[in-house]
From Swiss-Prot:
UniProt function note: Bidirectionally degrades single-stranded DNA into large acid-insoluble oligonucleotides, which are then degraded further into small acid-soluble oligonucleotides.
Superkingdom assignment: Bacteria
Protein localization: Cytoplasm
Gene Ontology BP term (one): DNA catabolic process
Pfam families: Exonuc_VII_S (PF02609)
Protein name: Exodeoxyribonuclease 7 small subunit
Catalytic activity as recorded in UniProt: Exonucleolytic cleavage in either 5'- to 3'- or 3'- to 5'-direction to yield nucleoside 5'-phosphates
Cellular component GO terms held in the UniProt record: cytosol; exodeoxyribonuclease VII complex
Highest classification ranks of the organism: Bacteria, Pseudomonadati, Pseudomonadota, Alphaproteobacteria, Hyphomicrobiales
Native source organism of the sequence: Rhodopseudomonas palustris (strain BisB5)
């Protein structure tokens, strides 16, 4: 399996990638997919999972916490520590 996601996967939004991943999981869980097709859609599922992980990391990096002064007025932002 290649390390890089196929070009079409790299263009998907988080929501679209997650929707397709859920469809793949349902098909695999159903157990009615031939072996060769199962392997192919499993590999696509892995690429979709990597895409979702990448987009989540990007979103997390952009989330900021609003900082306030002593009176509670917003004065800026700083990275949100989600840990």
């Amino acid at each position: 399996m290649a390390d890089a996601a196929p070009a079409d996967v790299k263009k998907l939004s988080f929501e679209r990638a997650m929707e397709e991943l859920e469809t793949i999981v349902k098909r695999l869980e159903d157990g009615k997919v031939p072996l060769e097709e199962s392997v192919a859609i499993y590999e696509r599922g892995e690429a979709l999972k990597r895409r979702c992980d990448e987009l989540l990391r990007q979103a997390e990096a952009r989330v900021d916490k609003i900082t306030t002064d002593a009176q509670g007025k917003p004065v800026g932002t700083e990275p949100l520590d989600v840990q």
